[in-house]
């Protein structure tokens, strides 16, 4: 296995878990709307995020906001004066700076173990804690540096994709070996191990990028304005065909 294989597989799994998870979340949202119930969005184009913190504001919003409100904020001694629907919109009026880092790593460690009681999930949680901590320090030391959103997105996506390795790997050794390949220059000299299916893999990656990034309009707006009228027309034609057959 080469570094190219690791990158390819991490991107493919990152797209797979996003499409799988967000798909049945949207199925639940759509089913609820048929019954006149509106649930908050659980995914908001996470791979369009411009930094790690922004990613977790967009990914599995119900869980990440719950962890933030009921675990992270209490751990850092934050006082919250209001909560909006879904745990979003907290107003923090006081917090202890010294507790932020401890709360960050502890809450992410717990979040990792919540996904599964093994070392790989703990590593997954601590990886994201370290990434968020590193980004926080970067912002503190480069407040005057302005980065274009597209460039920031291009820098954020590979960092988040590498975080899926411990989530999917079979063991800690497997995780460490794959990460080691990423930082080993010689491993980039090897060819892609998936070269027999290179065209298919390339097509899947391109489709994944286009499907994962932000649309100009929110998904439900597209469905309502463009797909819904077509669906209604098809429904009328289908009913007319039934009448003719009867």
Language model features: what each stretch is:
Residues 1-209, 217-246:
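Membrane-embedded transmembrane alpha-helical bundles that form the catalytic cores
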């Amino acid at each position: 296995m080469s570094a190219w294989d690791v990158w390819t597989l991490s991107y493919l799994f990152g797209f797979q878990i996003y499409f799988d998870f967000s798909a049945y979340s949207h199925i639940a949202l759509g089913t609820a709307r048929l019954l006149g119930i509106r649930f908050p969005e659980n995914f908001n184009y996470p791979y369009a995020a411009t930094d790690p913190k922004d990613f977790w504001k967009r990914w599995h919003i119900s869980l990440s906001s719950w962890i933030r409100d009921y675990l992270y904020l209490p751990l850092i001694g934050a006082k919250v004066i209001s909560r909006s629907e879904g745990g979003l919109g907290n107003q923090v009026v006081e917090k202890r700076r010294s507790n932020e880092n401890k709360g960050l790593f502890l809450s992410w460690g717990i979040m990792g173990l919540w996904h599964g009681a093994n070392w790989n999930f703990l590593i997954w949680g601590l990886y994201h804690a370290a990434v968020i901590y590193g980004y926080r320090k970067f912002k503190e030391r480069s407040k005057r540096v302005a980065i274009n959103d597209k460039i920031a997105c291009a820098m954020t996506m590979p960092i988040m994709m590498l975080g899926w390795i411990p989530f999917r790997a079979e063991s800690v050794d497997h995780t460490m070996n794959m990460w080691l390949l990423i930082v080993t220059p010689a491993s980039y000299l090897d060819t892609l191990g998936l070269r027999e299916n290179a065209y298919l893999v390339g097509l899947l990656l391109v489709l994944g990028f286009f499907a994962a990034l932000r649309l100009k309009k929110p998904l439900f707006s597209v469905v309502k304005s463009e797909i819904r009228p077509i669906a209604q027309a098809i429904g009328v034609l289908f009913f007319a065909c039934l009448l003719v057959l009867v």
